[in-house]
Amino acid sequence: TIGGEVNFDPSYNGNILVNAMAVGLANSDRIFRAAATGPGNPVIYVGAKTGRDGIHGATMASAEFSDETESKRPTVQVGDPFTGKLLMEACLELMASDSVIAIQDMGAAGLTSSSVEMASKGGLGMEMDLDLVPAREEGMSAYELMLSESQERMLMVLKPDATDTARQICETWDLDFMPIGKVTDTGRLVLLKDGETACDIPLAPLVDDAPEYDRPQADVPARPILASADVAKGTTIGDALVNLLASVDLASRRWIYEQYDSQVMADTIAPPGGDAGLVRVHGSQRGIAVITDCTPRYVEADPRTGGAQAVAEAWRNPSAIGARGLAITNNLNFGNPEKPDIMAQLAQSVLGMGDAARILDTPVVSGNVSLYNETDGRAILPCPVVGMVGTIDDIASAVGMAPTGDGQALVVIGQDASQDDGWLGVSLY
């Protein structure tokens, strides 16, 4: 764990957000995708067994909470990091053995999303026998097997002559390996259960042809700018500084990041606590910079500017240690989009993020969405988290935050709030 960010606000008390960003390295000519190809090729289930945990986990994540709905929370699945590590190593070995045609994890909506998306991306169909799905509970229905979100599971399409090799690899890593179906050319999803057809539907309406929401947006004006000259000066600069330093929003995050190992494999160059985390590409002098950023109070005050600011800050932080940003990802955390004011926050934030990405010539390569973050009708502060990855050619040229000698100059770059047209930008002050 080499970096991160923490924000506090009472609106998160009922919906605590945890956004995680994982970054890895891959050979550009050995990237495996999720498009199923080859009618007749076997569809393989790999990983942990399927249980009833996590059923409707995605649905639960798309609902407001209240005291009456508190009982829904236990539907969230429980991860098993050790099994996850075994599954990761097995997948890498399977890929190295040239057995894999397509692969996708079973995330939200479990086997439903992975099978439908893989078949759709390949322009084909899929048939599966749910009686063959490894289950850890008895009597699971087709509905439960398809919607379970039990963790540490993968769905793969393998080369027909590679099944035995793949089975041996998975058994070596103590993982379930089960052929549960095949790729078809029908453009349909067919599910068998107890010897009967439980489902036979076209794929297109579930994926590309699914209806899109066009929700109404409220006209929410941005907050008026408060000029620095208009701020009451009821306290001394010293008292103001003490109050700011006592704020949880500015206090050290050491109590959080020291609970995690930031030095695994001894390649960490810039540990947590700086502008960006920096790790060495193992066995080389190149480095990868990683950062996540968002200031929710900015987004609440002006969604479009706040969304742009999240991208801009994520872009600035790698440059502050000497790295050059490559691309961003995002996780859009908002309240109930069925409410016009929340939908306006979401839409305007995305527009602002796009504005900044185009100006900075930065691609957005992936993303995630977490909506309906409300409890008893109170929405969270809008929080479009932006993750940035950058590179540095020589880690020896990386720059830290600490001064390195006496007499060095302190320089402020950018607009100064003390200027005539300066403003405090929703600062904590």
Segments from the language model and where they lie:
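Glycine/proline-enriched, intrinsically flexible loops and inter-domain linkers
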Residues: 2-429
